[in-house]
Amino acid sequence: MKTNRYGGRKAIALSVACALMLPMAAVPDLAHAQSRSKKTTSREAALESRVNQLEQQLAELKAMIQEQKTQTTEAATTAQAAQVQSQQTEEKVAKVEKVVATVPPKPAFTTGTAPGVSLALHGFINASAFTQNKAYTYGNGANSEYPIPAGGANRADGRVSGVDVRNTRFWLDFTGAKFNENWAGSGRIEMDFFGGFNGTGAYAGSQPELRMRQAYMDIANASTGTTFRIGQMWDLMFPLDYIPQSLSHIAFPLGYGSGVIGWRFPGAIWMQELNHGSEGTKWRFDMAVLQGSWNGPGANATTNYQTAGNAGFKPQVEARLTAKGGNWQAFVAGHYSKVDLHGVDGLTATPIKSNLKSTAVELGGLWTPGKFIFKSVVYTGNAIGEVFGDLSQFGDIKDKGGYLQAGYKFDPHWTVYAFASVSKPDENDVLRWRAANTPGLLKSRQKAASLQYTTGPFDFSVEWIHANLDSTTTNGLGRQKTAGNELTLNGNYRF
């Protein structure tokens, strides 16, 4: 009985011990389970973060795809609109082509003997409203130069006003003709409306007639810089590139015959570029042989080649040397001719001299520094009435003169100009060669100022011109002074 009781207690103790041991045995398993749970949570968090990142990238890709779809749709719409516009344009072109096809073609310009020639029309339309307080030499309005002195023909002291369109000019330029393999041809015909008026009736003043100014051909060799000009053109004493700027005095420039000399004559000019094709200052030499000219002898000897300058073969010979830089150019020119005052028939009496020599030297230039413009020419000569010197008095008369113009460009549109010129023939020579019962012209001075506005092919200006003339009385014994003023409003359209 004791043994059984003792054995029972032992069994109970063992059971209790096992029961107590069970939690302890479970502790490692629990720790292991907790470790596994922690690892699973970390992985899930990383996976969730990756999923979120991928979802964000997916959303961005979807947005990009949507944007590309929108752009593609817009491009397709634009392309469709462009295609529609192109089709409409093609339809319009087709309609125009049909209309053009119904218009008969203009005949092509041909010369027959000079194929390939092209023709260009250039010129300008000019109108000048003027008022002046004297009648002027050469005419009133656009060709007025200095006032007529007391005792002179057509003198008038009253105010003269009008609107003058005679400066209007046009010319035809011909280019493209081939002389041979090395030489090409071109030409020009130039006209204006200073050919007088259509009669003397009540309406003649509104009918100015055409006048030929120039008609010449050029034969040029581009490889050598050589040009021959044949026909009627400006002589080498006329400072064509240096003419004072004016919208009222174009055909008859400011100071013409009163500081500006030169005229147009038939003949031939040789022009040679001395340093053709080289860099730096450009040098050119010109030489001209021109028809002789003079006033008289006789009242009807100024036309039909009957002047003293046409007697025998005595052409005018001129030469000019020109240098041209970047913003400047200058020239020196010379003139010579011999005049037989007996006339073509050799029968005219010559109480003073039977012949005389016409000579002149001229120097001039222009300079355009910045916004400034300067032009100036001076000359000295003898018996140069044939080239508008000596105040258009014909005889063995010494003369000296010149002009200066200065301008300033405020901007591309507005420019102001100031001008002064003088011509002073020798007084003793004038008295000796003065025609009977006419004033002898001793000295002319001209001043001018203008404000010009230019836009595109249009020019407008207001100009004021003041002229002073010293002269003799009609008997040659007394001296007198005459002054005149002219105010003009001018418009010009170039084409």
Which sequence ranges carry the predicted segments?
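Detector for outer-membrane/organellar transmembrane beta-barrel domains
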Residues: 312, 323-441, 445-446, 453
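Gram-negative bacterial Sec-dependent N-terminal signal peptides
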Residues: 2-31
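Outer-membrane beta-barrel "beta-signal"
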Residues: 453-455, 481-495
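Outer-membrane beta-barrel translocator domains and adjoining extracellular loop/strand segments
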Residues: 135-140, 198-208, 241-247, 295-313, ...
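C-terminal closing repeat unit and adjoining cap/tail of repeat-based domains
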Residues: 450-464
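Outer membrane beta-barrel
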Residues: 107-147, 152-295, 313-314, 318, ...
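N-terminal periplasmic/intermembrane-space "pro-region" immediately following the signal or transit peptide
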Residues: 18, 30-138
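Membrane-topology and secretion signals of cell-surface/extracellular proteins
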Residues: 290, 391-393, 490, 495
